[in-house]
Amino acid sequence: MKLDTHVHLLISKTARPDWDEIRFTLDAARRNGLDALCICEHLDAVHYADLLEGVFDANRVGGERLAPGVLRLESGLLLSSGAEVSLRGGGDAGVHAPPDVLRRLERQKGFYSLPELLDVLKAGGGETAVVAHHVYFGRKWIDELPVVGKQLSAIELPAKDLASREKYELLAARLELPLVGGGDGHTWLQIGACHTEIGEAEWPDASVFSIARLKDALKRYRAEPVAVAGADRLVRMSRIYRQRLEQAAA
C-alpha cells in the first residue's frame, strides 16, 4: 500500500473546487503509483464544505462509495476524508475521520488547541486518527506536543522539509510514534513526493481502506515514509504551478 497521508485538492484557502483540475490530479496520482490519498484540506478554507460534499457525497470524481468518507475510483485509487486543522498557538494537525465527524468541527482557524481537538474527537466517538503536520517547517511547532503527543497516531515527514528528516525521526522516537510521509501538495506535481508505504504482509489488499486499518498498521510500526527521487524539485515546480493557477483564477 502506497498512500499520501496529506493531500490538498484546493489551490488556496479561497479557491473554489476546480473539478477538472481535481480529476486530473487524482489520475496523475494513480499513474504515479499511489494506491490511496488522504484528503486533508484546510478546515478553514472558504470552500472546504463544498469540496467535502462534492467528493464524498455528490461523487463529483466518479467513484464507488465503500464507506462514509471512503471512495474507490475507477482507476483503483482510494480516497479517504480528512482535514488539516490550524491550531491555536500555531501548528497544524491532520484529522482523518468520516465526513460527519469533520462537519461537526469548528472551522475557525486557531479555535482548538491540540489537547482540545483530541478531546473533541474522542468525545464524538467513531474511528479517527490525528497526525502532527510539518512541525519543524517554519513556525509550525505545536507547543503542547511534548505533553499530549503520545495520544497522536503519527508524526509527519513532509516533502517540503526533507532536510529536517533526522529531527522528525528523533521526535517520533521520543514520543514513541511512527513516522509517515506526506506530500502536502496543492497540485498534482507534489502529491506523493513524500508518501507512506505499508508492506503487503500488513496490508495485503490495496483495493480497500479504512482508518482503523491505517491506525493498526501505524501502531505496529509497519509504515515507512518514502521520498521519491527529485522530491525537492517537485516541490519547487508545484509551487510555481500553483502560483500560475492562482493567477489564472484571479
Model-derived features: where do they sit?
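Generic beta-sheet signal
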Residues: 82, 133, 182-183
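Short, well-ordered beta-to-alpha junction loops that form the rim of enzyme active sites
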Residues: 42, 133-136
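A metal-dependent hydrolase metal-coordination microenvironment
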Residues: 1-118, 157-175, 189-190
